[in-house]
From Swiss-Prot:
Keywords for this protein: Amino-acid transport, Membrane, Transmembrane, Transmembrane helix, Transport
Family: Belongs to the amino acid-polyamine-organocation (APC) superfamily.
Entries under Pfam families matching the protein: AA_permease_2
Protein's membrane topology: Multi-pass membrane protein
Gene Ontology cellular component annotations, sorted alphabetically: fungal-type vacuole; membrane
Recorded GO MF terms: amino acid transmembrane transporter activity; gamma-aminobutyric acid transmembrane transporter activity
Intracellular or extracellular location(s): Membrane
The species this protein was found in: Schizosaccharomyces pombe (strain 972 / ATCC 24843)
Residue spans crossing the bilayer: 41-61, 71-91, 106-126, 166-186, 196-216, 240-260, 280-300, 332-352, 391-411, 413-433, 451-471, 484-504
Protein name in UniProt: Uncharacterized amino-acid permease C584.13
GO terms under biological process: amino acid transmembrane transport; gamma-aminobutyric acid transport
Amino acid sequence: MSIFKKSSNTAPSQHEDVEALASDEADLAALGYKQEFKREFSAWTSFCVSFSVLGLLPSFASTMYYTTGYAGTPAMVWGWLIAMVFVQCVANGMAELCSSMPTSGGLYYAAAVLAPKGWGPFAAWLTGWSNYLVQVTGPPSVAYSFAGMILTLVQLHNPNFETQNYQIFLLAVAAMIAQGFISSMPTKVLAVFNTWGTVLNMLFLAIVMITVLAVAGTKTPRGFNSNHKVWNEFDNQTDWSNGMAMLMSFAGVIWTMSGYDSPFHLSEECSNASVAAPRAIVMTSAFGGIVGWLLNLCIAYTIVDVNAAMNDDLGQPFVVYLRQVCNYKTTVALTSLTVICSFMMGQGCMVAASRVTYSYARDGVFPFSKYLAIVDKRTKTPNVCVWMNVVVGILCCLLIFAGEAAINAIFSVGAIAAFVAFTTPIFLRVFFVKEDEFKRGPWHLGKFSKINGYAACAFVLLMVPILCFPQFRGKDNTPDAMNWTCVVFGGPMLMVLIWWFVSARKWFKGPRLTIGVDDAVSEINVLEGVTKSDDDSISTLKKK
């Protein structure tokens, strides 16, 4: 029976009840889910959460080693611009899918719907687990950076202080526990908290940019770097060509910009979701890309010595850069602002991760899913999922004791896992779904949809292997210098594949609908081009 056709066996009262639903609830019902959360996010507050997850200032500080250290200032200026054009293509394609299918399952749900007949469960399985790796490694990677910067402040005050791994671990754990408590609060409180978090992020970012421009040249006689130096002089600290080093530097851009999917996962808590959520996605990527480029310009024109910043014993390139440009008190002040932004960023990551985890638990992906999918009756938030992610994040932080190379792999995993998850449904949409089989939402790209999709997919196909390349090769590629991304990402994904073929393919049938077909909505609100069989799994949705 098609879910876009009315059933002759359906009582009129059922349709009357459904037509009385708010538009957002009706759209969600059309996708097979009943309303569980309170819709207290707007386009602005959804943007605030995703911009907090983006955390431009702490994200840049955390990934400066990749963005600047691989190829120097050219990677910061025109390299960032090149990467952002294609990152925006991915964001645009995601926004179009979000407008059509505004569920917290997001990319995972879209992959199940758009995959060819018989491949829906497998597509959803891989997309879901890859996206979960993005979400669950986000909070610990941010917490690790947060802890590192706090201890760097101690080192600035006392140069004889030596940071110990257990200190980083305990600070990171404390941060995630605090963020877990905040993320367990009601949606309305989260909206207010993240609004203020975004305001502070923007304010502190502006303060840092204005300050470094104002003080440039006061500590050293060089003043601003020349245009030729900034745009043309590579400082290649890899064993690869300048072009390859430039592509490898995109890892910092991709990781920094990987938070724009958050509005998709918050769409079930957003009013006017089919319009507000995709707008928030595009706003986050576009605004983040532009402001991030301006931040890069400020640093590129004021940095004194790229090589010294990357290789200083302090181990924090951004703080070393500030020390090159500013006096002690200003360096401490700007680093402190970055630490505060980092905490806000980690909290946004925790919220987004909990919503993704809930959507998967609702569909029975995890062991003990029925317990994980419990929504707190008082706060109307998935608090069990929040604390599961806190526990997993703490386990990820144990990599701190395995060495810097192991814990740093989390950053690369976030980039590559995000790209795989973000682009899989876009790939399916572009190559396997005809235009007349896909019902666009109110936000769409029109005739540019396919072109945008081709550009996004081509960029991802290029970047996925490059993100696995080590900085050095030959005898210089020691275990400590090795890029372990292929292991840290490939290992879990290999286990997921084995799990699929051994067991999951027998019981996982894709996203489970929590509302019956006859309880859905009238034909105008339903995703076209699919039909549903008698079981309640979207994996049985087929093209007409």
